[in-house]
Design a protein with these regions (language model features):
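Pyridoxal 5′-phosphate
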Residues: 5-431
Length: 431
């Protein structure tokens, strides 16, 4: 189908003589990211503050800012022309960049606005029947809990939540995997977990869980197969792993946290042999999906990207700048990002362990922790501790859970001196 024929059918064809704006944004390639100081220089973060909560909502590095500014300018100059010239190619380019980052097929990646949107689309669209069992945990975020509740109510399924550990700091991988797999029942069709618990900093051994579920599935028919779904947001952008490494069936994450991507962006990845388990909730506006509806493309099976990226008009200047965030990470190197994040996190945890009035809840081992570090200050609530730190220009966060711990999350924008200043401030926080 020709693009102009498609646009005539949608009421958006322009005059034959229209001069269309520049097709795309080209990010400068001469920026050196060979030192952590150079990496930090790419951000407009206030240097008078120590930013230890980028995992909540990140600042944009220069390549992402420049791309957003470019797209915004072009939309403001001629919105319809710029959209017409780019709409068919830009979202597939973003999926391609995400797929390159996770070493997956671009057709397996759908674009979302957030982890919450991804989880909502996944779980409420998951094909369950009355009596099916959903197994989850007591450590998941509100977004997972509510999405699963809506899915259960919609399908008359049941939900069970198991506690994998009482205290994260001394939990073991064997204990957690054993507890979860022992809770699987014959009618369990969906296992939903969170990779890194933002309430405690615990990082689950996703691959080990995936292998255990695969073993159980080997004795089941396809109809009774268990599907393994992961809220991966707080490992995504930290850990040097691929989707093949994790071994799950579905993976949801936002890209405006550890990825430092445009605000209001995210991905939902689905393994090819699991696509048919999820029914779309929001119609896609992809070129193939819309073209089939118009009768201008032969009917056929749509891939996950084309079918499950929600349609409608988005904040295009942000969505179309997502590639630059993934490119930024890849230019630094995924392993370097992972090593640096763990280095600073380990330094912080070791320092906090030596403070008498601090209780560290996050495991010290990097096998069971990622970039989130959760702790309590004796005699203070998490909000009080974070507020006190803010008087020292240290920006942290309080975990938004019924039981809340204070959190400091150093990332690649931080340095050793800032970590030392955080430890020193916490040593004196009760004075």
């Amino acid at each position: 189908m020709q693009r102009r024929s498609f646009l005539r059918r949608t009421g958006l064809a322009l005059g034959a003589g229209a001069v269309l704006p520049s097709l795309s944004f080209t990010s400068p390639s001469n920026v050196s990211l060979d030192s952590w100081a150079n990496v930090r220089s790419q951000f407009l973060l206030d240097p008078k503050r120590i930013h230890m909560a980028q995992m909540f909502l990140a600042s944009h590095p220069k390549p992402v800012r420049d791309a957003i500014d470019h797209h915004r300018k072009m939309f403001d100059e001629s919105p319809v022309e710029y959209w017409e010239h780019n709409w068919k190619t830009m979202e597939p380019e973003m999926c391609k960049a995400a797929a390159n980052y996770i070493q997956a097929d671009p057709t397996e990646v759908a674009l979302t606005d957030s982890t919450t949107m991804g989880l909502g689309l996944l779980y409420t669209g998951f094909q369950l029947k009355e009596g099916d069992d959903i197994l989850s945990t007591t450590h998941d975020h509100y977004a997972t809990d509510k999405s699963l509740e809506y899915a259960a109510a919609k399908n008359k399924a049941t939900i069970r939540r198991v506690t994998l550990y009482k205290e994260a700091s001394n939990a073991t991988a064997d204990e957690m995997v054993g507890t979860l797999t022992k809770a699987i029942q014959p009618n369990t069709k969906l296992v939903a977990v969170t990779w890194v618990h933002s309430v405690s900093g615990m990082k689950l051994p996703i691959r080990t869980i995936a292998d255990a579920i695969k073993s159980i599935n080997s004795n089941r028919s396809d109809q009774d197969r268990i599907y393994f779904c992961v809220d991966g947001v707080h490992g995504f952008g930290v850990e040097d792993v691929t989707m093949a490494d994790l071994g799950c069936d579905f993976f949801a994450a936002s890209t405006h946290k550890w990825i430092f991507g445009p605000r209001g962006t995210g991905i939902l990845w689905g393994r090819k042999d699991a696509w048919n388990k999820v029914v779309p909730t929001i119609p896609a506006f992809s070129y193939p999906a819309y073209g089939m509806w118009l009768g201008m493309i032969p009917q056929g099976k749509l891939n996950f990207c084309d079918l499950h990226s929600p349609g409608g008009f988005h904040s295009f200047e942000n969505r179309w700048a997502l590639k630059e965030a993934f490119d930024f990470h890849m230019q630094i190197g995924k392993k370097k990002v992972a090593d640096r994040t763990h280095q600073l996190g380990s330094m912080l945890k070791e320092g906090l362990r030596g403070v008498n009035h601090i209780k560290l809840h996050t495991p010290v081992s990097t096998e069971l922790s990622s970039g989130i570090n959760c702790f309590e200050v004796e005699g203070m609530t998490s909000e009080e501790a974070i507020k006190k730190l803010s008087t020292k220009k240290i920006i942290g966060s309080a975990a938004p859970y019924p039981i809340s711990y204070a959190r400091l999350t150093p990332s690649i924008i931080n340095n050793e001196e800032e970590v030392k200043m955080c430890i020193a401030a916490l040593e004196k926080i009760k004075e």
